[in-house]
């Protein structure tokens, strides 16, 4: 089976930001890594994560706070506000009551060190290495071509959404033109993000893999995991797959993702970054449309945004481009305040978007040889 049919569906990049599809063959990945002499543990196949059977009672979810000590993080009080906002948004926009277990805190290195390096290696071949300037532009464009093909809304809807964010006056749906545009804006804006500085004066995006979306995609490989992971890490990168169009508009910045997690209660987990809510770097503020947040508002908006990922996790909803009333509608750039004011549960239902049907989002998990021996 082709990886562009399956691997890329391992996750939904949200914020309400989404990311799906990896445009490479599984055998090609294995051969590439073998040629490099790397020890890898590539998947034998891929399996569809079923739509979860939700309990009738209140849904309880475990929570981890994964912290990069170099970056500003939410306080305990802000985390409480964030989780309260998620509870509220879930009840209003998803129709389910949720509660959270006590938050457990980990350093980013501590949380990821238990993931086998061999299971990270096959993902590394899919990373566009913008740090060393060794990316393959054609492969990136092809990844966007695949993302365009697999949208679940009419082309005019996603094209209009994207055109507004790049200043394109005339909206067209030409696939070739758009895959080039998406690659252009992705790399141009990622270059701006690469220049962000942390409080210590050093680049936020350093030589660690902490910023790489593929690094975060490996979370589901943990033997013991959490349903909800909150982090202060900036995740901004480029890949040869798992791309989605609204992430391109932000230069590959991803606020959150819902992905496979066999050990999690419902077979998936979500992670959500608070970086875009705490940073006041001019690049981030511009992406927020000039929005600046006090700590309490930042936490509340972060929770409303994270509820988007709950929709992926609980119902496997897609992205209803063109219906901003839906909590599942991708947030334009990072304008979370603007987006929150447009939410209207009744109007979302009335719109009857095909992306709001349970199970429309296909999430795939890798299957390894070791899994078959259990």
What are these regions (language model features)?
Residues 19-26:
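Sec-dependent signal peptide recognition
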Residues 40-249:
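Propeptide-to-catalytic entry region of secreted or membrane-anchored zinc metalloproteases
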Residues 34-35:
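C-terminal motif of bacterial Sec signal peptides marking the signal peptidase cleavage site
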Residues 277-374:
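The catalytic-center signature of Zn2+-dependent metalloproteases
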Residues 241-298:
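Active-site scaffold of zinc-dependent metalloenzymes
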Residues 45-56, 68, 182, 272-273, ...:
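Phospho-regulatory, Ser/Thr- and acidic-rich intrinsically disordered linkers and terminal tails
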Residues 1-19:
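N-terminal secretory signal peptides that target proteins for export/translocation
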């Amino acid at each position: 089976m082709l990886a562009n049919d399956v691997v890329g569906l391992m996750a939904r990049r949200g914020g309400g930001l989404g990311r799906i599809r990896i445009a490479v063959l599984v055998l090609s990945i294995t051969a590439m890594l073998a040629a490099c002499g790397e020890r890898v543990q590539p998947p034998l196949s891929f399996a569809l994560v079923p739509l979860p059977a939700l309990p009738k009672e209140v849904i309880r979810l475990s929570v981890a706070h994964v912290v990069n000590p170099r970056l500003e993080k939410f306080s305990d009080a802000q985390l409480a506000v964030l989780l309260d906002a998620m509870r509220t948004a879930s009840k209003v926009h998803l129709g389910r009551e949720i509660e959270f277990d006590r938050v457990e805190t980990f350093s980013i290195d501590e949380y990821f060190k238990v993931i086998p390096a061999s299971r990270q290696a096959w993902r590394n071949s899919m990373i566009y290495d913008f740090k060393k300037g060794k990316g393959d532009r054609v492969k990136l464009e092809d990844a966007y071509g695949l993302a365009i093909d697999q949208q679940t809304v009419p082309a005019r809807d996603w094209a209009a959404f994207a055109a507004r964010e790049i200043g394109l006056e005339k909206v067209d749906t030409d696939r070739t033109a758009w895959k080039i545009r998406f690659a252009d804006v992705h790399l141009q804006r990622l270059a701006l993000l690469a220049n962000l500085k942390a409080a210590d004066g050093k680049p936020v995006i350093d030589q660690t893999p902490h910023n790489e979306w593929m690094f975060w995609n490996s979370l589901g490989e943990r033997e013991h995991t959490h349903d909800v992971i909150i982090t202060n890490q900036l995740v901004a990168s480029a890949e040869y797959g798992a791309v989605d169009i609204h992430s391109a508009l932000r230069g590959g910045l991803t606020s959150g993702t819902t992905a496979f997690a066999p050990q999690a209660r419902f077979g998936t987990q979500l992670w959500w970054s608070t970086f875009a809510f705490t940073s006041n770097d001019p690049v981030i503020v511009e992406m927020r449309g000039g929005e600046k947040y006090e700590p309490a508002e930042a936490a509340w908006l972060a929770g409303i945004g994270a509820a988007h990922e709950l929709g992926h996790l609980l119902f496997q909803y897609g992205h209803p481009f063109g219906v901003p009333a839906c909590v599942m509608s991708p947030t334009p750039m990072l304008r979370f305040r603007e987006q929150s004011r447009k939410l209207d549960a009744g109007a979302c239902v009335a719109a009857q978007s095909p992306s709001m049907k349970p199970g429309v989002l296909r999430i795939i998990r890798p299957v390894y040889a070791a899994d078959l021996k259990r």
